[in-house]
């Protein structure tokens, strides 16, 4: 619900920090576009620094999220992460086409992240969004040879990939560092 309130600009990025602190959470996961006109993606360097300062004052970790894996999206998310003092960037690929071609494009995106940002101090997490199965995600992580790359497990996304979530969890478990929790019903 916070995401939807952020889309309506009723909860803004700084508010999310307050909510996390008030609920004794360890940090926030925030998309570069959360808050619309007031999003991190629309903040200048001074505002991003102030957001990071507030998170540190509240002893909160920041995880930046973006909804693509292309260079421009990664560059934007990493720039925001570094300016706010975030610890990680979550991304997910959004490509269509032949699976072999899509996996190749994603592998190239990950290679770009490795070559450009492996020494940035950030960790990177790839999330499956409906298309890739667990073994394909694990292969992408292993083949990347990138120690700072891990997987985000989302129960419902595995259903959308036509894979039983518990089986997917078992396959992905050694590489999972983040989880999205939500209800889902297999019909």
What are these regions (language model features)?
Residues 75-101, 105:
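Active-site gating/metal-coordination segments in enzymes
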Residues 39-49, 72-73, 97-109, 133-135:
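Active-site-adjacent beta->alpha loops and helix N-cap segments on the catalytic face
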């Amino acid at each position: 619900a916070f995401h939807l309130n952020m889309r309506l600009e009723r909860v803004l990025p700084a508010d999310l920090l307050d909510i996390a602190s008030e609920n004794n959470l360890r940090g926030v996961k925030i998309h570069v576009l959360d808050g619309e006109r007031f999003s991190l993606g629309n903040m200048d360097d001074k505002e991003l620094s102030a957001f990071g300062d507030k998170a540190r004052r509240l002893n909160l970790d920041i995880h930046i999220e973006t909804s693509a894996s292309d260079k421009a999206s990664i560059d934007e998310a990493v720039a925001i992460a570094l300016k706010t003092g975030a610890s990680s960037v979550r991304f997910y690929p959004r490509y269509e086409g032949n699976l072999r071609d899509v996996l190749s494009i994603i592998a190239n995106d990950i290679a770009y992240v490795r070559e450009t940002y492996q020494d940035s101090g950030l960790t990177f997490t790839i999330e499956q969004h409906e298309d890739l199965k667990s073994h394909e995600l694990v292969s992408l992580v292993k083949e990347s040879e990138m120690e700072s790359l891990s997987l985000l497990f989302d129960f419902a996304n595995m259903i959308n990939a036509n894979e039983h979530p518990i089986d997917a969890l078992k396959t992905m478990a050694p590489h999972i560092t983040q989880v999205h929790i939500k209800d889902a019903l297999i019909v």
